[in-house]
């Protein structure tokens, strides 16, 4: 049931990104505060190798991804969403690939050019909120 809820949230969020381009994009991210950690990626093209690697890793590590309440906001250069959020995260000039991890508290936890998901999991697992989640898991 929890998986269905998480997946439903992810699908609704993806639909919102494309359907509501006039809504302030910071508001879209605020919807996830306290419920999800958000990986925002900025890529210069859909075929960007770092972007594709991250998407592949999300599928490969889907259980670990869901366990950490992650959602992925995938932004391609030239779109309205990219423009708005790149300003919010102070991206300047041409960006080949940039990944920003936002914690459940709404704060930026990581800004990197790496798309290594296991490294992101390791970082998340050191966060106080995640440590509390681990202690309450029943597996």
Predicted segments with their positions:
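Non-catalytic interaction/Regulatory regions outside core domains
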Residues: 2-139
């Amino acid at each position: 049931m929890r998986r269905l809820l998480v997946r439903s949230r992810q699908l609704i969020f993806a639909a919102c990104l494309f359907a509501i381009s006039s809504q302030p994009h910071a508001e879209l991210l605020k919807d996830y505060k306290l419920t999800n950690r958000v990986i925002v990626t900025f890529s210069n093209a859909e075929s960007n190798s770092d972007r594709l690697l991250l998407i592949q890793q999300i599928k490969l590590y889907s259980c670990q991804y869901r366990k950490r309440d992650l959602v992925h906001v995938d932004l391609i250069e030239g779109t309205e969403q990219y423009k708005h959020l790149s300003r919010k995260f102070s991206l300047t000039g041409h960006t080949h690939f940039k990944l920003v991890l936002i914690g459940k508290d709404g704060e930026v936890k990581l800004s990197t050019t790496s798309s290594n998901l296991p490294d992101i999991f390791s970082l998340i697992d050191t966060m106080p909120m995640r440590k509390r989640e681990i202690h309450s898991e029943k597996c």
